[in-house]
Amino acid sequence: MASLNQEQLKILEQTRQRLLHLTQSLGSLSNSINQSDPLPPWSSLQSQATIISNNLLSISHLLTEHQELLSSIVAYPTPNFPGRTESTILHQLMRTKLEPRVEEWVARGRNVARHNTASSQIRAQQGAAAEGETVRLSVDELLDLWHWAPIAANMEARRRDWGGDYTLEEKEMGVKNVITGLKRQLDEGDEEDEEEEEEEEDMQGEEMEVVVGAHTKAGGGSGVEFDIARGSSHIPSKPVAPGMPLDDIFRFMMTGAPPRPR
């Protein structure tokens, strides 16, 4: 390939600048999340995400517009290139294949784009054929949906913590090292059972009157008198002392003076 002209060099420089802006935006978002405690406000994160989205859109338009030029450019070192001191950059420039992780991302993105393009064409054809009717998924699309949905739902469920006292990260670090876990929701039914048991005990402890005998009234009067005896398990309640006035309580709290006898 012949040497690049000024217009082609300008396109390469624009691509480099926009990739640099994207790298800086991603680094800024990563630092704000990792170093801020507490996390930045939602408006700040949303603003940074919007900037990253605009950078990605700009790079996508630039790569699509100059796809022919960028795909035909070949990098090669000149004799003056410092290959020994800049070997890392040289290997990156001479690399002909993407990294495995990046290659997987590209394949996934192309698959999604291909599927969306095919679905859009099918919907457009169906809309042109029957305008106003509800667009339904095809058999292949339904099969793909039913194959994808349970796997995606299972993966999403595993990434979340469904009702434990501690999060997955806290369990991995060790529960003993956790200062405060998630608050457990107590069952109100336990409190109601305890109140019912206390009421039954109080009823059993209440005094019971028992008729133990009967005799005629003293003095020769007409009628019958009954002898009433209390249950053997009855325990007389202790008299309750009167409550302390609030004035004495506040005076003791402020000055330490003991309450006045009553």
Swiss-Prot record:
What the entry lists under Pfam families is as follows:
Med8
* InterPro entries reported in the protein's UniProt record: Mediatior_Med8_fun/met
The yes or no answer to whether the keyword Transcription regulation is present is yes
GO molecular function per UniProt: RNA polymerase II cis-regulatory region sequence-specific DNA binding; transcription coregulator activity
State where composition is biased (Acidic residues).
188-206
Question: Where located?
Answer: Nucleus
Coiled coil, from the record: 168-211
Give the record's subunit note: Component of the Mediator complex.
Q: Which family does it belong to?
A: Belongs to the Mediator complex subunit 8 family.
Name under which the protein is recorded? Mediator of RNA polymerase II transcription subunit 8
Q: What organism is recorded for this protein?
A: Coccidioides immitis (strain RS) (Valley fever fungus)
